[in-house]
Regions:
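Nucleotide/phosphate-binding catalytic cleft detector across ATP-hydrolyzing
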Residues: 1-12, 162
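Phosphate-binding glycine-rich/basic clefts of nucleotide- and phosphate-handling proteins
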Residues: 24-169
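Short loop/turn elements that form and flank the Walker-type P-loop nucleotide-binding site
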Residues: 6, 18, 151
Length: 171
């Protein structure tokens, strides 16, 4: 006897930094696997080969976080941030900003510097994340229609790039 949902179409979306990988499972069998170069670096990267000076997220939050590090006497981390900023690679800056939420030194000082929460609280910034996910889902829908697949019953997201979903909702 088939398990519940075994006959439905399921889509697994693995979002990395540089690519998004999609697996379509239909009637319990893997039917289609594809990958495309539209992933987390699309949101947080340098785009069109510019540098971090043109990245809106870096520009908006670098001074805020630098000031938080200075105010809380976290000069070592401030120096690391300056070093990362000097390299002008947006993905490195963004990765560092995300890492601060779990940084041992920051936790030891009982300071909260949570870049993901800052983004979640930024109503304008959320639109970028929404558009990113809508673009991925739209691309998958067009692909599935072209290949003759039914609308999926479930869609799962995995990979480091999928963590930005938490900016939209913690559920």
């Amino acid at each position: 006897k088939a398990k519940k949902g075994a006959t439905s179409t399921v889509v697994s979306v693995d979002i990395g930094g540089g690519t998004t990988d999609v697996l379509i499972v239909d009637k319990g069998e893997p039917r289609y696997l594809t990958s495309f170069r539209f992933a987390a670096n699309t949101i947080f990267g340098d785009g069109y080969s510019y540098d971090s000076d043109s990245n809106g997220f870096v520009n908006k939050y670098k001074d805020i976080i630098t000031n938080q590090l200075e105010t809380n006497n976290l000069r070592g981390l401030k120096a690391v941030l300056k070093s990362v900023l000097d390299k002008r690679v947006s993905t490195d800056v963004i990765a560092f900003l995300f890492s601060l939420a779990s940084n041992k030194e920051i936790k030891k000082e009982k300071v909260e510097i949570n870049f993901a929460q800052m983004l979640a609280d930024d109503n304008r910034g959320k639109y970028v994340v929404i558009l990113f996910y809508v673009a991925i889902v739209y691309h998958i829908a067009k692909l599935m229609k072209a290949k003759g697949f039914d609308m999926p019953r479930h869609m799962t997201f995995s990979g480091n790039g999928s963590k930005v979903l938490n900016i939209l909702s913690t559920n």
